[in-house]
């Protein structure tokens, strides 16, 4: 059974918190689908080329049909002309969004947390509050964890706490309502407040 590591105020291991057994039964394909959907939603569909009907001009036949010794042509917007339309070029009317349902999102998050717990990279603390708002205090916590890139998850971060974590390059502070499977998978380790952890564990499968 995979377990999260409970840390005390000195960031030393004090206990272990078991994850529900059903987490082990979740297929990794749910995580794959969510990450694919998340990244596709970030894709900027900006590549575009004008077709021959979208290029300006071309209303007049460039030269007469016969007698010129040149190939016949009906419009300068033809793809064979410089400045003409593009055949089979990229279009910005394509929608890359991939939708998944609420249950799959939930399963993906549970799968990501389970994987972090298996790796021994899921930590639980009582609070992440940084009343001082100083980066050095947040860095001291990060350094004490002896981890690499770390996702911190708070129930609801206040402004001082947000400011304390903002400038740390290998860290990211997320609120509970911002937490998703992609964020969990993107960082090497996850530090989550116990209140948030308890809420996640208490929720039923797929809800």
Swiss-Prot record:
SUPFAM superfamilies: Ribosomal protein L4. Pfam families: Ribosomal_L4 (PF00573). Residues 49-73 are annotated as: Disordered. GO terms for cellular component: ribonucleoprotein complex; ribosome. One of its GO terms (molecular function) is structural constituent of ribosome. The keyword Kinase does not apply. The keyword Transmembrane helix does not apply. Transmembrane segments: none annotated. Keywords: Ribonucleoprotein, Ribosomal protein, RNA-binding, rRNA-binding. GO terms for biological process: translation. InterPro entries: Ribosomal_uL4, Ribosomal_uL4-like, Ribosomal_uL4_dom_sf. Part of the 50S ribosomal subunit. One of the primary rRNA binding proteins, this protein initially binds near the 5'-end of the 23S rRNA. It is important during the early stages of 50S assembly. It makes multiple contacts with different domains of the 23S rRNA in the assembled 50S subunit and ribosome. HAMAP family: Ribosomal_uL4_B (MF_01328_B). Belongs to the universal ribosomal protein uL4 family. This is Large ribosomal subunit protein uL4. It comes from Helicobacter hepaticus (strain ATCC 51449 / 3B1).
């Amino acid at each position: 059974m995979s377990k999260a590591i409970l840390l005390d105020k000195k960031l030393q291991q004090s206990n272990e918190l078991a994850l529900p057994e059903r987490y082990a039964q979740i297929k990794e394909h749910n995580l794959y689908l969510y990450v694919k959907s998340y990244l596709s939603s970030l894709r900027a569909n900006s590549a575009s080329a004008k077709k021959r009907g979208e290029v300006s001009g071309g209303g007049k036949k460039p030269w007469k049909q016969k007698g010129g010794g040149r190939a016949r042509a009906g419009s300068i917007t033809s793809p064979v002309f410089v400045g003409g339309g593009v055949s089979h070029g990229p279009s910005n009317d394509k929608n890359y969004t991939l939708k998944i349902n609420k249950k799959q999102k939930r399963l993906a998050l549970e799968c990501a947390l389970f994987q972090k717990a298996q790796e021994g990279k899921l930590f639980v603390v009582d609070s992440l509050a940084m009343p001082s708002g100083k980066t050095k205090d947040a860095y001291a916590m990060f350094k004490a964890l002896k981890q690499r890139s770390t996702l911190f998850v708070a129930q609801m971060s206040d402004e001082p706490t947000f400011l304390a974590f903002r400038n740390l390059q290998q860290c990211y502070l997320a609120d509970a309502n911002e937490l998703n499977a992609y964020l969990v998978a993107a960082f090497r380790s996850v530090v989550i407040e116990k209140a948030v952890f308890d809420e996640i564990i208490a929720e039923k499968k797929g809800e």
